[in-house]
Curated annotation (Swiss-Prot):
InterPro entries: AAA+_ATPase, ATP-dep_Clp_protease_ClpX, ATPase_AAA_core, Clp_ATPase_C, Clp_protease_ATP-bd_su_ClpX, ClpX_bact, P-loop_NTPase, Znf_CppX_C4. Zn(2+) binds at C15, C18, C37, C40. The gene is clpX. The keyword Isomerase does not apply. This is ATP-dependent Clp protease ATP-binding subunit ClpX. Belongs to the ClpX chaperone family. One of its GO terms (cellular component) is HslUV protease complex. Signal peptide: none annotated. ATP-dependent specificity component of the Clp protease. It directs the protease to specific substrates. Can perform chaperone functions in the absence of ClpP. GO terms for molecular function: ATP binding; ATP hydrolysis activity; ATP-dependent protein folding chaperone; protein dimerization activity; unfolded protein binding; zinc ion binding. Pfam families: AAA_2 (PF07724), ClpB_D2-small (PF10431), zf-C4_ClpX (PF06689). One of its GO terms (biological process) is cell division. It comes from Acidovorax ebreus (strain TPSY) (Diaphorobacter sp. (strain TPSY)). Component of the ClpX-ClpP complex. Forms a hexameric ring that, in the presence of ATP, binds to fourteen ClpP subunits assembled into a disk-like structure with a central cavity, resembling the structure of eukaryotic proteasomes. Residues 3-56 form the ClpX-type ZB domain.
């Protein structure tokens, strides 16, 4: 029963399975002398889903989503150390995207899974931003990074929080469906903390007000975004973006938070049975392991915002050995990058172990962490990279400890002789 002739000369097509005409269904798909309607296709999909064994259904639910172990392994290629943070992030991100797949297929009576946004706490240059970027790249989801210090309340000069959603849309070419499953990283979240425990008469347009605006975005709201990056004005059609399924990762150094934690833990450790341990004996990493939500509230984050970020993980301060590893081991390690740059000039780069340790010590002294490594190495090589295009027969550039510590020029090894300059 594929086709029948009506009173007119044109043919009316019918579904070969249910017999409905093309006018009774949304879509009719043609095969060799047969047709099937969209309703019959939906029915077939339901039958297949219902008859799948439990194990297969679980695998289908996960699809190509990497497991926490696979996510962590990928993070290991780019981020050195921070084992606890990587494991926590891997599980949180895996559960988030598993939750989205469950939500798509869940019935009305099934358990609803809540979103768990993430708060990363750690010193400058410890890898907070790199962790978020690497995650988004691995999962192939839209990613945007925002700076909390540029945000102000709506109506004031500066960016309002909906600009974050607009940037996320731009990153995926205004594909609303993809944007609604993206990742947003908000850096410097600690800089918008309340300046005082007491409410002020003056407006705090970049502090608590921004936290309140971010709260709505993080917990889930319909954000109105002008199409294709235009400015908001009346009588304009807006794109409506549901932020409920966007994963928010917030990061900050939280300088001074260690004092809040120490004051709380010391207050609870008073008495004859309390362990006596001086403040200097505990590193920043150790102190951050004792963090509680009440410490973040005391620091200046509003309780509602703290409650929307249940996954809190602290990143450790990077040691000298860890910084040396960062210089040499990751896929995009700085030494590999500069070696490639010099290789384009036909020159080999050698950075001696003592020089690597010296670079790491300088970064620690500057309190810039891994972020400061590039500027130290750039400073050591800038003169050589300026001269190399005009110098012939250079085979190798050698950076030793004196280059870093005493600002001496790197050694140049020439092809025709082993002389150095």
């Amino acid at each position: 029963m594929a086709e029948k002739k009506g009173s007119s000369s044109e043919k009316t097509l019918y579904c070969s399975f249910c017999g409905k005409s093309q006018h009774e269904v949304k879509k009719l798909i043609a095969g060799p002398s047969v047709f099937i309607c969209d309703e019959c296709i939906d029915l077939c999909n339901e039958i297949i889903r219902d008859e799948l064994p439990t194990g297969d259904a679980g695998r289908e639910g996960r699809g190509d989503l990497p497991t926490p172990a696979e996510i962590k392994t990928n993070l290991d290629h780019y981020v050195i150390g921070q084992e606890k943070a990587k494991r926590t992030l891997a599980v949180a991100v895996y559960n988030h995207y598993k939750r989205l797949r469950h939500k798509d297929k869940a019935g009305k009576d099934e358990v609803e899974l809540s979103k768990s946004n993430i708060l990363l706490i750690g010193p400058t240059g410890s890898g907070k931003t790199l962790l978020a970027q690497t995650l988004a790249r691995q999962l192939d989801v839209p990613f945007v990074m925002a700076d909390a210090t540029t945000l102000t309340e709506a109506g004031y000069v500066g960016e309002d929080v909906e600009n974050i959603v607009q940037k996320l849309l731009q990153s995926c070419n205004y594909d609303v469906e993809r944007a609604q499953r993206g990742i947003v990283y908000i850096d410097e979240i600690d800089k918008i903390s309340r300046k005082s425990d007491n409410p002020s008469i003056t407006r705090d347009v970049s502090g608590e007000g921004v936290q309140q605006a971010l709260l709505k975005l993080i917990e889930g709201t319909m954000a109105s975004v002008p199409p294709q990056g235009g400015r908001k004005h009346p009588n304009q059609d807006f794109l409506q973006i549901d932020t409920t399924n966007i994963l928010f990762i917030c990061g900050g150094a939280f300088a001074g938070l260690e004092k809040v934690i120490e004051n709380r833990t010391e207050a609870s450790g008073i008495g004859f049975g309390a362990a006596v341990r001086s403040k200097k004996q505990r590193s920043l990493t150790e102190v951050f392991q004792d963090i509680e939500p009440e410490d973040l509230i005391k620091f200046g984050l509003i309780p509602e915002l703290v409650g929307r970020m249940p996954v809190v993980t602290a990143l450790a301060e990077l040691s000298e050995d860890a910084l040396v590893q960062i210089l040499t081991e990751p896929k995009n390690a700085l030494v590999k990058q500069y070696s490639k740059l010099l290789a384009m000039e036909g020159v080999e780069l050698e950075i001696r172990p003592a020089a690597l340790k010296s670079i790491a010590r300088k970064a620690i002294a500057r309190k810039t962490g891994a972020r400061g490594l590039r500027s130290i190495l750039e400073q050591a090589l800038i003169g050589t990279m300026f001269d190399l295009p005009n110098v012939s027969n250079v085979e190798k550039v050698v950076v030793d400890e004196a280059t870093i510590e005493e600002n001496k020029a790197p050694l140049l090894v020439y092809r025709e002789a082993a002389k150095t300059a």
